[in-house]
Amino acid sequence: MQNETEIYTLLQDLCQKGEYSDYGCCLDEIEIFIDAAKIINTSKHVCIICDWQWWDLNVEELNSNSDSGLQQYPCIIMANYVIEDQAGRFNQGDWVRSSVLTQFHQNCIFETSNTFYLLVGTGTRKSLNQDKIKAKAV
């Protein structure tokens, strides 16, 4: 019964919107920030998203990725709507969840080890604690 309660609590936390965030760019700025991402790293694809949530994962620590030397921060993006994915992994209208943040640029470019997520419009930000994250993995 305890496991069901933990899952229910996790689902409640995941469904809550979180606090308003002023990150994100305007629709008419998308091309400007795609170009900015390409200046940072020409080999990474851009995934343009809206209706997004920034999740701060309250975990003890994420280590540097020893293979790439990248620092990872305990944050991910979950978006309910993909506008465009330059890599062709997702269709317009799909939802997506990123891997962990490696860098955040210009208030709207969420960089992971292999992708730039361009946050369009306003979104929300919330925290999930380590115990709830572990419960999700069960």
Predicted region positions:
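N-terminal non-globular leader segments, chiefly Sec-dependent signal peptides
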Residues: 1-104, 122-138
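Amphipathic alpha-helical packing elements
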Residues: 107-121
